[in-house]
UniProtKB/Swiss-Prot annotation:
ATP-grasp domain ranges (all copies): 104-287
The protein's name in its UniProt record: Probable alpha-L-glutamate ligase
Gene that this sequence comes from: rimK
Source organism per UniProt: Citrobacter koseri (strain ATCC BAA-895 / CDC 4225-83 / SGSC4696)
List of residues binding Mg(2+) 2: 260, 262
UniProt keyword Manganese present: yes
Cofactor note: Binds 2 magnesium or manganese ions per subunit.
Cofactor(s) for this UniProt protein: Mg(2+); Mn(2+)
Known EC number: 6.3.2.-
GO cellular component: cytoplasm
GO molecular function: ATP binding; metal ion binding; ribosomal S6-glutamic acid ligase activity
Keywords, comma-separated and alphabetical: ATP-binding, Ligase, Magnesium, Manganese, Metal-binding, Nucleotide-binding, Protein biosynthesis
Ligand binding (Mg(2+) 1): 248, 260
Record-listed Mn(2+) 2 binding positions: 260, 262
Length: 300
């Protein structure tokens, strides 16, 4: 097969591993910067171009689109989809998962347990919002934040009010969530491919922090997950419509709680911690699903 990887930086670990895994299985691979793709959108001659040339048909496209370029990156991916390429994560699923508020609403509708979450626009509702999530300590999150950026633990009610007011002063969209104290700065990252959790790690926050993101200096170890955690991770990914997802779960006294569903999970931390060939599993999923029937169905 001919596979395109959409990424701004082909030297990143995940891109290199996906390229390596695909080539090892006999596929042709090209890494394309989505911001250098441009499109002709017309009924008779839709096409996609790259650095002065019209791109050929790709059997499959692997999106590695960062949150900063979600709008244009998913537009480029959507054009590949329209031309019959199989996407490992559809554009609509990526945009759904990137919207933190929408994704939490969808997960809640499916009965998937979450930390109690509140959102309000008016400053008049701040007090009720804090009460809604159980009072302080609580977590304030930027809706647009990633990798632990824009996440603040407010230890007291006064601190919570100050943080919320400060974010509002910047015209930022925020969520307020209950603080799961018993998680002790730990969470479980489940890597889902299709209908299977192929690997899971426990992430631990560095000393003095409560954010367990590896990008923030957190540590990782292999996690043994329960059947319930496995079921919830798969259901969360499927609710977003994602073939590949990193599902972050907090272990609370009342049971596992989904914190976030990541549409473009990094492979380095999970592969190096567990030894699982996740890139290979992703390519195998493409091989099973990027069929001629798919191309006919989508008009390719």
């Amino acid at each position: 097969m001919k596979i395109a990887i959409l990424s701004r930086d082909g030297t990143l670990y995940s891109c290199k591993r996906l390229r390596e895994a695909a080539m090892k299985r006999g596929h042709l691979v090209e890494i394309l910067d989505p911001l250098s793709c441009y499109m002709n959108i017309s009924p008779a001659a839709s096409s996609i171009h790259y650095k002065g040339r019209q791109l050929p048909h790709f059997d499959a496209v692997i999106p590695r689109i960062g949150s900063a370029i979600t709008f244009y990156g998913t537009a480029a991916l959507r054009q590949f989809e329209m031309l019959g390429s199989y996407p490992l994560n559809e554009s609509v699923a990526i945009t759904r998962a990137r919207d933190k508020l929408r994704s939490l609403q969808l997960l809640a509708r499916q009965g998937i347990d979450l930390p109690v979450t509140g959102i309000a626009h008016s400053p008049d509702d701040t007090s009720d919002l804090i009460d809604m999530v159980g009072g302080a300590p609580l977590v304030v999150k930027l809706v647009e934040g990633t990798q632990g950026i824009g996440v603040v633990l407010a230890e007291t009610r006064q601190a919570a009010e100050s943080v919320i007011d400060a974010f509002r002063g910047l015209n930022a969209h925020i969520l307020v969530q209950e603080y799961i104290k018993e998680a002790r700065g730990r969470d479980i990252r489940c890597l889902v491919v299709g209908d299977e959790v192929v690997a899971a790690i426990e992430r631990r926050a560095k000393e003095g922090d409560f954010r367990s993101n590896l990008h923030r200096g957190g540590m990782a170890s292999i996690a043994s997950i329960t059947p319930r955690e496995r079921e919830i991770a798969i259901k969360a990914a499927q609710t977003m419509g994602l073939d590949v997802a990193g599902v972050d779960i907090l272990r609370a006294e009342r049971g596992p709680l989904v914190m976030e569903v990541n549409a473009s999970p990094g492979l380095e931390g999970v592969e190096k911690t567990t030894g699982v060939d996740i890139a290979g599993r992703m390519i195998q999923w493409i091989e099973r699903h990027a069929t001629p029937e798919f191309c006919l169905k989508t008009g390719g």
